[in-house]
Amino acid sequence: VPYTIQLRRKQEQVKDLLGAMIAADKGELRQIVGMKGEPISYRHKAATPYAHAGRGRITCGFYARGSPRIVSCNDCLAEDPRARHILNAVGRAAELQHIPAYDEDKGTGVLRHAVVRCGYATDDVLLTVVTNVAQLRQPGRFVSAIRDAAPEVTSIVQNVNTRRTNAILGFTNNTLWGPGTMRDKLLGCTFEIGPTTFYQTNPAQTE
């Protein structure tokens, strides 16, 4: 759908929801301000679930609509160009280290999700690997395999989530390599960002 039509539809949705209230208050619904140019490569945070793919393989990508099935994805136009490569590299590193993917139905396995944050104004890249266990076997080898495949990553953190939940992140973080945080600049301010920090996923639109 062309971006101009997306914006028009959003404008119509807001008007349908709030139009009567705005009119009652004698207010004005201003035109939605969209991004400059086409909305591609704008998401500086990306996440993926992992699942068994048979014969020791691991798949990652996006959930199919209305289904727990994961559709593999090698690239996503909405995300920072670095993001999907890094998320896929985690899956390949887990395969090399024989780290099993999480099974939602059984609640077994290790690798649940990964979340990557890519700097907008810096080259920092924070990777958070979400596991179903507190202690990884030979974490150093796992980290080395990720770094070999994705040298742009500047820090790797393990997040522990052992709950049977749809929430991606748990409450415990263990830094596996690097500072455990990243830094980015937005609107003239420098932010230190951790695995659970709220930060704008679309910095260009924010500015």
Give the residues covered by each predicted segment.
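Accessory RNA-recognition modules of RNA-modification enzymes
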Residues: V1-E207
